[in-house]
Amino acid sequence: MRTAVSPDGIRWTAGPRGLLDEFVEHSSFYKYNGYYIVNGQTNEPWRKGEGGAPRGRQGFVYISPDFEHWLKESAESFALPEPIDPGERGLHKAYDQVHLGTAPLVYGNVAVGLTCIWRNRETFTDISGDFALVLSDDGIRFREPVKGHVYLHAEDSPVTGVPEKPYNTVLCQSNGILNVGDETRIYYGRWRNAWLPHGALSEDYYGEVALSVLPRDRWGSLEVDPGKEQGSVWSAPVTLPAEAFELRINADGTSGIRVELSDERFRLLPGYSGNDSGFVRQDGLDSPIVWPGEHPGELAGQTVRIRLRLERSDLVEPKLYAVYGVVQ
């Protein structure tokens, strides 16, 4: 891996070689909590699992505090389960592995993105790759909000085909997730797996760039359990901005949503809970929360938790996508 810098995004100067002691196939480069992070996969056979057993492809991060000095030590970022039998583990065994690590979009105190589920097979051209949704609270360790869920199947976004040749598609994530207006645009690779034995290439070996679009930040929704009429959820501790700010939500069915604030130990705050709970007047991608009691600006710089209560009715089906703190 090498760094590179540019004054204009067109002309680039490569940095020094030998930053790391291993081969890395990376999909993303981002900054989180002041650290520069490269997220990718490694195939190094010296990386062992439980009891010294072999491992398949898994995701790791490589970290720098200043972009110039990179830690020689890496950290596991996202890994899929290895087979129970250690003899069935390894790069060339037929089970799901992680390809290219994780490519996230950073939203301040959370990162949301995609990883590729590499459907490893003994015959290379039988391999395909689907996308899974992952998120992180520190930019290093990622997890699936719903374990085992395929966010985008390769067969639902296939690479341009070749007549009478049913090649598999491998979806490849990258630093191509952008918020543009009211959309989240996901640019990603579609790899036509036409690899031949012994690493030779055919004229069918090919890749292309694809685009999938979401309503902005609507990666998934939190809803009331189908068998219930109401439910609630707490946030992790959040330090509110020291300057003027506004809390907003990305939601539908907002007449069925109420917002409360507590201290870090879950004790609800007077003026921000109960009859003074916040509410939203309209559905939308960034709807302001209205507070009948105190304004959250009075809590500037303090650490709080956000509690959201959702209530379903015959006319309202609340769906929560995101909560924002917007500096004004």
Predicted regions and their residues:
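Carbohydrate-active catalytic/glycan-binding domains of CAZyme proteins
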Residues: 1-328
